[in-house]
Amino acid sequence: KINGLSYEEIAKRGGGILNSAKRLHETSEDGLYEQALERVYEMIGFGTGAADIKSGYGLSTEDELKMLRVIRRLKETTPLTIRANFLGAHAVPAAYKGRQGEYVDLICKEMIPAVAEEGLADFIDVFCDKGFFTVEETARMLEVGAKYGLRPKIHANELDVSGGVQVGVKYNALSVDHLERTTEVEIECLRNSNTIPTILPGTSFFLGLPYGNAKGMIAAGLPVALAS
């Protein structure tokens, strides 16, 4: 990023999410829990009372389940109110490069049923954006998630006007998150829904992206949420 590469370019080169997934694969469940436990108590020390914790850095059935099991342990062993969010559709792993449809199949046919069988997630999330997952792929995963009782959240409009807001509203997502690139069309769509727009100014600051149009959303009467 310091060298001027975009988020999408970094992902194409195997960095970013994919690099984090490699490191997570090499970390044991107990090791991951100890790291996360330290961060949870740091958050509590800063006054955080509740957190949505996502998976999404496993990108295989085994490692996604590992992350979600750690989240369950944190729920059971800390005073923080935690909701677990299955984000297997965070990126296409290196093993599925050029075979994105097959990875979506894996999420729908193997990951979601396995997550549901163990009761590991409260929500399902998808990174619906340029260079990641399409509106059609997102809709398919949300439909399967709904069959297993997982309400959607969506990563939307971080990198482009992606259609993620509209698909989120269509499937009654609790929230659509990021929204760095949002037009009046998305704002109007949200006005006629029960979906909450969530903006992430820290992402904009860190990645050098536009800031979400919070003032425009508030002026339109939307209840805007902030996240880190």
Regions found by a protein language model. Give the residues of each.
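Alpha-helix C-cap/termination motif
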Residues: F46, T77, E117-E118, Y171, ...
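Active-site-adjacent C-terminal substructures of enzyme catalytic domains
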Residues: R151-P152, D160-S228
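Metal-coordinating catalytic core of metallo-dependent amide/deamination hydrolases
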Residues: G15-L37, Y41-E42, G49-S162
